[in-house]
Amino acid sequence: STLFPYTTLFRSIMAKKSREATQKRFGKTIQFYIPLYLSNECSNHCIYCGFNHKNKISRVTLDDDEIIAEVKVIKKMGYEHILLLTGESPKHSGVEYLEHAMQLIRHYFKQITLEVQPMSVDDYKRLIVSGLHGVYVYQETYCKERYTLYHPAGKKKDYNWRIDTPDRLGIAGVHKIGLGA
């Protein structure tokens, strides 16, 4: 139901025009991506997350050989788009690590997207040069009071830094910005 009382005929015409415009712009394609976890190191203390800094788990950050081995398996599966993920640990998987990893794999993929800790505009610009196409940022809640409860320590505790990430991505010129909650 809509606010404007469209007729069934008018709605079908709009739907047809919309479909045509979408196909003209994007073609008849569906794009799949595959995730690759580069690191589970994390400096945050999010109460809901298995990567929580306090959790006593085996921590791993992939080295060059491990990254390439994973990428070769992924390519055999036919994927052209990859999502690189890490815990939020600038010490273990900061901009230098991500830049290097992207340079290692960029010739394997049409698109590289990240789901990592929020960064500065300059850091995102560096990563664009290394092949960054998109970034996904998840905001677990928009309620500032609840956010503080869920994120008691670590960089992620800074609500404003996190919520302003899409703005920094846009300023940096990142092509695709994905938001989730």
Segments the model singles out, each with a brief description of its role:
Residues Y6, T29, H81:
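A residue-level signal for beta-strand positions that form part of recognition/binding surfaces
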Residues H53-I68, I74-L98, M102-L169, H175-G180:
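Core AdoMet radical
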Residues K24-E66:
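Canonical Radical SAM [4Fe-4S] cluster-binding loop centered on the CxxxCxxC motif
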Residues T2-L9:
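Short, small-residue-biased leader/transition segments that mark boundaries at the very start
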Residues S12:
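Catalytic or ion-translocation cores adjacent to nucleophile or general acid/base/metal-coordination motifs
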